[in-house]
Regions:
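Second-shell residues forming the walls of enzyme active-site clefts
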Residues: 1-118, 122-126, 133-136
Length: 138
């Protein structure tokens, strides 16, 4: 548990891994959702250097493997104050860690255009999953 709000600053959680799995992560085990969002939280005892959205270990080893999540992983808003002010760097870090999509809620058209020019094309897995979900909704 953290007393911080990632809209304002970076929350840091010091719980032991075993406690995190039992109390926090277990809720997501074998979740059948098509989408899941990462959190801008630093789990000190899991990855002491990277917040969850930027952590290859948390995304690939925990969310994808241990929790068996097979859907699209979306970053939380990359313009939140818990992160640096460089949106392109934030987007790259999230995608490189394993997020399929990045969320930008800042509403600045110039920043949105800049991000779109710099981001890579959505991968085949994400396209396929998004299309499947779209067909499900129809």
């Amino acid at each position: 548990c953290s007393n911080s709000d990632s809209h304002l600053n970076l929350p840091i959680v010091y719980k032991k891994k075993s406690k995190l799995y039992k109390e926090d992560f277990s809720l997501f085990k074998n979740l059948s959702s098509n989408f899941m969002m990462t959190a801008h939280i630093l789990y000190k005892n899991v990855d002491s250097k990277n917040l969850a959205t930027f952590s290859n270990n948390i995304i690939n080893q925990i969310i994808r493997k241990k929790l068996n999540f097979k859907g699209i992983l979306i970053s939380d808003d990359i313009s939140m104050k818990a992160l640096s002010k460089n949106l392109s760097v934030n987007a790259d870090k999230a995608l490189n860690a394993g997020c399929n999509l990045v969320l930008y809620c800042g509403g600045n058209i110039k920043e949105s255009s800049k991000l779109l020019k710099n981001l890579r094309t959505i991968d085949e897995f994400t396209q396929k999953k998004t299309y499947q979900f779209y067909n499900f909704l129809r």
